[in-house]
Amino acid sequence: MNPANYLILSALLFTIGTVGVLVRRNAIVVFMSIELMLNAVNLTLVTFSRINGTLDGQVMAFFVMVVAAAEVVIGLAIILSIFRTRRSASVDDVNLLKY
């Protein structure tokens, strides 16, 4: 398959993730959209690594996946805290955590 197809797919996935972050108000959906954007970046890194014939992009994608795993743990803990205090996972309720 042509590497340009992977880059187009990556751009499409990143665009879908960006629209999800900007449009949705549910924290879980926003969180999933951010993960989709990270996976699009990983696909781009692996594609450019394949084009250049080096492993640099694949190593970087691995580190992005490790950081994303830590982000999942912390992000879900924050979302769970918001849900327990407000009984809603809305992004609009985040500024109310201080009360």
From Swiss-Prot:
Cited Pfam families: Oxidored_q2
Reactions listed under catalytic activity: a quinone + NADH + 5 H(+)(in) = a quinol + NAD(+) + 4 H(+)(out)
Location(s), subcellular: Cell membrane
Transmembrane segments: 3-23, 28-48, 59-79
Primary location: membrane
EC number: 7.1.1.-
A GO molecular-function annotation: NADH:ubiquinone reductase (non-electrogenic) activity
UniProt keyword list: Cell membrane, Membrane, NAD, Quinone, Translocase, Transmembrane, Transmembrane helix, Transport
Gene3D superfamilies referenced in this protein's UniProt entry, alphabetically: 1.10.287.3510
Topology of the protein relative to the lipid bilayer: Multi-pass membrane protein
One of the GO biological process terms: ATP synthesis coupled electron transport
Translocase found in the keyword field: yes
Any one of the GO CC terms: plasma membrane
Quaternary data: NDH-1 is composed of 14 different subunits. Subunits NuoA, H, J, K, L, M, N constitute the membrane sector of the complex.
Functional note: NDH-1 shuttles electrons from NADH, via FMN and iron-sulfur (Fe-S) centers, to quinones in the respiratory chain. The immediate electron acceptor for the enzyme in this species is believed to be a menaquinone. Couples the redox reaction to proton translocation (for every two electrons transferred, four hydrogen ions are translocated across the cytoplasmic membrane), and thus conserves the redox energy in a proton gradient.
UniProt-listed HAMAP family: NDH1_NuoK
Similarity comment: family membership: Belongs to the complex I subunit 4L family.
Protein name: NADH-quinone oxidoreductase subunit K
Organism this protein belongs to: Frankia alni (strain DSM 45986 / CECT 9034 / ACN14a)
